[in-house]
Amino acid sequence: MAILGNKTNEVQSAAQKVKVKTTTTTIVAENHPSRNGLSIVNTGSQNVWLGFGKAAVENEGALLTPGGSWNGMHGPMLWTGSVMGIAPAGETSVTVTEV
């Protein structure tokens, strides 16, 4: 069981390692309207740019530096749409966990 705020939810799936490519946008997390939690951690050695509901583009969206993470929140709201990623400097990986 994973704890999210005051809620206890079953983790939807084990943490998934996703390879993020350099020239094409990779789907990091699918659109999931009933998502209760999301964590994306850059476990690779290259920067990753995240696009929300659209293709990821360098210098737009959110930047995850190596070792950086994003908790799925936009202000007070949990993002339930798709998350795309691109790593312009070289292929790298992120770990994604959804609740």
Predicted regions located by residue number:
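Short, intrinsically disordered N-terminal pre-domain segments
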Residues: 1-19, 93-99
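Hydrophobic beta-strand residues in large extracellular and virion-surface proteins
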Residues: 40, 50, 83, 94-96
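Beta-sandwich interaction modules
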Residues: 30, 65-79
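Forkhead-associated
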Residues: 33-43
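Surface-exposed ligand/attachment interfaces on beta-rich extracellular proteins
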Residues: 12-33
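Short, surface-exposed beta-strand/strand-loop-strand elements in extracellular ectodomains
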Residues: 41-61
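Noncatalytic modules at the cell exterior or secretory-pathway interfaces
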Residues: 36-38, 75-91
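Short, charged recognition helix plus adjacent turn
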Residues: 20, 58, 64-65
